[in-house]
Regions:
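C-terminal capping/lid segments that line or modulate ligand- or cofactor-binding pockets
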Residues: 1-103, 109, 113-117
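C-terminal beta-sandwich/jelly-roll accessory domains of carbohydrate-active enzymes
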Residues: 99-154
Length: 154
């Protein structure tokens, strides 16, 4: 799933990538709630561990609850070499992440405020100790800002 989702994002299919990631994440969460643990891998078409998967094992199966949550569901993706950070906002609920590593020296805090609808322009509060370019995406719209060290709302 991770490889397919990444390929879809690279080809501009953000909505489909989000839907697949969200479905996979939700299924992993259901399995966790039912069994109390994470598994080595998961069944591709059912809400259950994969055939002969080991419990209490976070290998490739850890991509959904960690990377999938941050990169696809929260939409936080970085390109440190170009000093760019993207927040692709799909949720209407408030969410955020503190101490997101940005390269060797940077830490970034991101807080996305709640919205009344998916079409409403998101407000993103960003705290960074390094300069970067922030792009906020929602639907077919986007806004970009140059972020200086400190806190600002975009």
């Amino acid at each position: 799933n991770y490889m397919v989702i990444t390929g879809l994002l690279q080809q501009g299919y953000r909505k489909l990538a989000y839907e697949i990631a969200r479905n996979h994440y939700d299924n992993v969460l259901k399995v966790y709630k039912n069994t109390g643990t994470f598994w080595e891998y998961y069944a591709p078409e059912h809400e259950e561990p994969g055939f002969m998967a080991r419990p209490n094992f976070v290998g490739w199966g850890g991509l959904a609850p960690i990377s999938g949550l941050i990169e696809q569901i929260f939409g936080i993706r970085s390109n440190v070499y170009e000093k760019k950070l993207t927040v692709d906002v799909n949720l209407t609920e408030a969410y955020g992440i503190d101490r997101y590593p940005f390269g060797l020296d940077g830490l970034v805090g991101i807080k996305v405020k709640a919205r009344s609808s998916a079409t409403q322009e998101p407000q993103v509060e960003i705290t960074s100790d390094v300069p970067l370019e922030l792009t906020v995406l929602w639907g077919d719209k986007q806004k970009t800002a140059n972020v200086k060290p400190g806190t600002q709302t975009v």
